[in-house]
Amino acid sequence: ANAVANAVVQIALVLVIGHFAYDVTWPQDWPALLVFSLLGVTAFAALGVALAQAIPNFDSAAAYVNAAFLPLIFISGTFYSTSGEPAVLRGIAEALPLKHVIDGLSGAIVTGKGVADHWVAVVVLVAWFAAGAFAAVRWFRWE
């Protein structure tokens, strides 16, 4: 619940500041924005809880998170199109959740393509949520 509330505030701030300070247009497909925001938050929250069991202490958490997330950011098309990447990296990116969050949000905000146009992204994100939730329930323990 905290992750979703935090995401709602952040998304609202980015949209409002982007619109009024930088003349960015409002999203073209609000329902798709909502769906992909929620799918992204829930998938990454579940994966975060699952990963938390492997982190030995608070001091090392940033190193573990960065080791997992920074490569994901660079191969998933966060900063540039993945079309110029080698086929191997594109294939890896297609299997990972961030690429599909980016595609869904980009469709909702920029192109107006909705959830039906990104059904593969929905399937991939639901699968990552399910895997993360399963791993979290199976192995996470409060100690």
Segments (PLM) and residue ranges:
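Central hydrophobic cores of alpha-helical transmembrane segments
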Residues: V65-A68, A93-A95
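Solvent-exposed alpha-helix faces
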Residues: A1-N2, S106
